[in-house]
Amino acid sequence: MMTSEKDTEQNEELNEKQKPPVSMAGRVAATGFCGGVLWSFVAYIAYLFHFSEISPNMILQPFVLGEWKKHGLGTVISIILIGVISIGAAFLYFLLLKRLKTMWPGILYGLVLWLLVFFVFNPIFPDVRTVTELTSDTIITTICIYLLYGLFVGYSISFEYNELNSEKLARALGMHRE
């Protein structure tokens, strides 16, 4: 019985070693997409419970015609589209801030993204009022969601980057990491 367990463990170890590791770019893209989908879904829930006046499908407003964009299909497409756009934001974080190991750069990154969306890109979205016209509930809710998005993406990318570097260092020094 013991030999079959050992054989199974050895086979699992061989399979893990034979699998090609996921590239850092793949990890960044996955983190960005998942972060965008997760936090835009949270934003949609906040919209449903009237914590925010802004729904994720605001992203479709200037580019797509029809009323369908304000309903279920429009919301799903918007959440996925935000996930795709978020891949670019994740790569931007990776290029600029990946070496920083604390949570604060991610939180500040989320704040910068909020400022960009609500001050710089606001004129693109005709259905979104200016920040001075939004309710305080909307402002606070959206800031919190952007801060959490920045924390999620930033800390995940920094962790993966530093973990990958420590694995490379351990291999270079001939040490085995678990």
Swiss-Prot record:
Residue pairs linked by disulfide bridges in the UniProt entry: none
Transmembrane annotation, as ranges: 29-49, 76-96, 105-125, 139-159
Entry keywords, A to Z: Cell membrane, Membrane, Transmembrane, Transmembrane helix
GO cellular component, one term: plasma membrane
Organism: Bacillus subtilis (strain 168)
Superkingdom of the organism of origin: Bacteria
Name by which UniProt lists this protein: Uncharacterized protein YqhR
Pfam families recorded: YqhR
Membrane topology: Multi-pass membrane protein
